UniProtKB/Swiss-Prot annotation:
Primary location class: cytoplasm
Protein name, per record: DNA topoisomerase 4 subunit B
Cofactor: binding details: Binds two Mg(2+) per subunit. The magnesium ions form salt bridges with both the protein and the DNA. Can also accept other divalent metal cations, such as Mn(2+) or Ca(2+).
Gene (UniProt): parE
Catalysed reactions, as listed in the record: ATP-dependent breakage, passage and rejoining of double-stranded DNA
Note: There is a bona fide GyrB elsewhere in this organism (UniProtKB:Q2ST75).
């Protein structure tokens, strides 16, 4: 990185005081669910990573403590401990004043992930306990807060030291978060990603509750990142790396073409994942496609005015695109930093990629021709798949072939599509009960009788031959694959309803894999849900009854109940009659449903590859760590994974 100027008390600026964070936490961390809880961790970790970006930190240690607090340790410069111009010690300002930090201009940090002084103070505001130990200027200082940022122990000199760095420990406030327990796997994946983006940086994660430990350090991070994503895909090219700088914007890219049908392109700006893309990814795609088309034209592979389609040329592409942009140039669209808006990033990345790839294609003609051959094959497959999709669409208009849906879909009678719901139900038995128990005004039922094909292993043209897949596509009514149009869907909710067992979980995963690969906008626009049927029916002697949804609810019931009762454990949806199914699983007033969302595309890729791939041991381990047939929240983000 380029030189960084002084980082001391004078570099800390205050924009406004800390107000109303506890009253409206969603404004600062997005939500108070699992995602919001872990956002507290990312803010503290990202501060440490900014020290690494600036060239002062080589190791970050994260510890999940036994009391469910979390500790983040870095060996950076340490937070300045002198008096701030506001008359308070600088650490007190950083941790108790919103928008206080050293990253609002380019004096202390040339580029950083964001205004992380905000994060430190917000993390403090949403914690029962927050403590910082600072190693700087051969001295150790401590400062402590409690109950949402109230100063418990002023900045205090503790001892002398030769170390430098900062240690933060905080305990989230369980009166604010719906579930204040940290997820080891989620944190591990995020830390691994940070290590991959910062070559040489060592990051460790320890869980003192379950005695787990992982360590990440990569000497060639982006190359390793691409290897992770490519995994068992068949490569077409070697991994290509591009590193250059223009207009004070540093561009680092690693990419590889594979034989796979899907593309994976992830973008980062100053280490922040841009889940909605932005100017850097627009520039990357434009530069790459222009270089390949120009090469194909120069080599007489294509006719004069013929150009390969951008989608066909990106099929099978795996790429990581990172840019480091000075603070005075970086712009994001919206508050969440999910989309880069810096206009210079497009022109810089496009020119760097175009020049490099133009040279690479000429120097690697055999591989270049293979990339173009694959694009031409993708074009043929796209046309064949389109014809198959059109054939499926035409089923609706042909009486003699309308038997595909006959006896399967029981439609809703309501005309307002956004209010209608489609239940995808496991088996004929449950499908029959669902048809009888539904509210026909807005609920449609599609029983799934046969086997849903594994979308992770089959090409789209083969998927479209599967009868269950055809039925789902027809029922949803918005096309599939590249032709999918979210504005055409027939339902505001698509609800997967299966038995609460491993077979049911497998069907859920098959359907979610299909939606993720070929109707991703359904998940992005939060249209997909999973129904949670109860596990137990409790019947009392007076014939009154209640339903319990999981073991935890049963345990709570047993601790407080004083009446005699009989208990029924439901093994499947088919054991419930129509009235019971309506009362417990379909009535909007009583049911519990999970909304499926995507917040991290990399985790999504890994999850689907693990669950639907060939590695049995990896799949078993993932299920053991992540799959629980119980309810934690009425709405859980099952797939916490960037688009």
């Amino acid at each position: 990185m380029a030189e960084n100027k002084k980082y001391d008390e004078s570099a800390i600026q205050v924009l406004e005081g800390l107000e109303a964070v506890r009253k409206r936490p969603g404004m600062y961390i997005g939500s108070t669910d699992n995602k919001g809880l872990h956002h507290l961790v990312w803010e503290i970790v990202d501060n440490a990573i900014d020290e690494a970006l600036a060239g002062y930190c080589t190791q970050i240690d994260v510890i999940l403590e036994k009391d469910n607090s979390i500790t983040v340790i870095d060996n950076g410069r340490g937070i300045p401990t002198g008096m701030h111009k506001t008359g308070k010690p600088t650490p007190e300002v950083i941790f108790s004043v919103l928008h206080a930090g050293g990253k609002f201009d380019s004096t202390a940090y040339k580029s950083s992930g964001g205004l992380h002084g905000v994060g430190s103070s917000v993390t403090n505001a949403l914690s029962k306990r927050f403590k910082a130990i600072i190693y700087r200027d051969k001295k150790i200082h401590e400062i402590e807060f409690k109950n949402g940022g109230k100063l418990e122990k002023p900045l205090t000199f503790i001892n002398t030291t030769y170390k430098t760095g900062t240690t933060i420990n905080f305990l989230p406030d369980d009166t604010i978060f719906s579930n204040a327990k940290f997820n080891f796997s989620l944190i591990s994946e995020r830390l691994k990603e940070s290590a991959l983006l910062n070559s040489g940086l060592k990051i460790t994660l320890s869980d003192l509750i379950s005695n787990r430990y992982v360590e990440y350090q990569f000497q060639d991070g982006l190359v390793e990142f691409v290897k992770e994503l490519v995994d068992d895909k068949t490569p077409v090219t070697d991994i290509i790396t591009i590193n250059n700088e223009s207009k004070n914007i540093i561009v680092e890219i690693a990419l590889q073409y594979t034989e796979d049908d899907n593309e994976i392109i992830l973008g980062f700006a100053n280490n922040v994942k841009t889940i909605d893309g932005g100017t850097h990814l627009v520039g990357f795609k434009s530069g790459l496609i222009r270089a390949i088309n120009d090469y194909a034209k120069d080599q007489k592979i294509l006719k004069d005015k013929t150009k390969l389609d951008s989608n066909d040329l990106r099929e099978g592409l795996v790429a990581i695109v990172t840019v480091k942009i000075p603070e005075n140039l970086i712009e994001y669209e919206g508050q969440t930093k999910s989309k880069l808006g810096t206009s210079d990033a497009k022109t810089v990345v496009e020119q760097i990629v175009y020049e490099f790839m133009s040279y690479w294609l000429i120097e690697n003609k055999v591989l270049a021709n293979k990339v173009i051959e694959n694009a031409l094959n993708a074009q043929k497959a796209r046309i064949a798949a389109k014809q198959a999709r059109q054939a499926i669409k035409s089923v609706k208009g042909k009486k003699n072939v309308n038997k595909l849906m006959l006896g399967k879909l029981t439609p809703a009678q309501g005309k307002k599509r956004e209010l209608n719901e489609l239940y995808l139900v496991e088996g004929d038995s449950a499908g029959g009960s669902a048809k009888s128990g539904r509210d026909r005004n807005f609920q449609a039922i599609l029983p799934l009788r046969g086997k849903v094909i594994n979308s992770e292993k089959a090409k789209l043209v083969d998927l479209l031959k599967n009868e269950e897949i055809q039925s789902i596509i027809n029922a949803i009514g918005a096309g599939v694959g590249k032709d999918f149009d979210i504005s055409d869907i027939n339902y505001g909710k698509i609800i997967i309803m299966t038995d609460a067992d491993t077979d049911g979980a497998h069907i859920q995963t098959l359907l979610l894999t299909f939606f993720y690969r070929h109707m991703k906008d359904l998940i992005i626009h939060k249209k997909v849900y999973i129904a949670l049927p109860p596990l137990y029916k409790i019947t009392f002697n007076d014939k009154s009854f209640i339903y319990l949804w999981d073991e935890e609810e049963l345990n709570k019931f047993n601790k407080t109940n004083t009446k005699k009762y009989e208990i029924q454990r439901y093994k499947g949806l088919g054991e419930m009659n129509a009235d019971q199914l309506w009362q417990t699983t379909m009535d909007p007033k009583n049911r519990k449903i999970i909304q499926v969302t995507i917040s991290d595309g990399l985790l999504a890729e890994r999850m689907f590859k693990t669950l639907m791939g060939d590695d049995v041991e990896k799949r078993k381990l993932w299920i053991q760590e992540n799959v629980k047939f119980t309810l934690e929240d009425d709405q859980i983000q099952i797939i916490e994974m960037e688009k």
